[in-house]
């Protein structure tokens, strides 16, 4: 899980979601693409 100021989808499977007021990227194919804004 990367924590960075701006989160962007890295590949075509990355999904941008909001969880508890935080913007997150989840990726089913490549777990390295997981990000959280903070």
Curated annotation (Swiss-Prot):
Its domain of life reads Bacteria
- Which Gene Ontology CC terms are recorded? cytoplasm; ribonucleoprotein complex; ribosome
Supply the name of the protein: Large ribosomal subunit protein bL36
Name the species this protein comes from.
Streptococcus uberis (strain ATCC BAA-854 / 0140J)
Question: GO molecular-function annotation terms?
Answer: structural constituent of ribosome
| Gene name as annotated | rpmJ
Q: Pfam families, per this entry?
A: Ribosomal_L36
Where does the record locate the signal sequence feature?
none
The UniProt keywords, alphabetically, are:
Ribonucleoprotein, Ribosomal protein
Please give the InterPro entries that the UniProt record associates with this protein: Ribosomal_bL36 (IPR000473), Ribosomal_bL36_sp (IPR035977)
GO BP terms, alphabetized:
translation
Stated family: Belongs to the bacterial ribosomal protein bL36 family.
């Amino acid at each position: 899980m990367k924590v960075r100021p701006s989160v962007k989808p890295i590949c075509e499977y990355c999904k941008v979601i909001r969880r508890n007021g935080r913007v997150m990227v989840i990726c089913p194919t490549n777990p390295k693409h997981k990000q959280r804004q903070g």
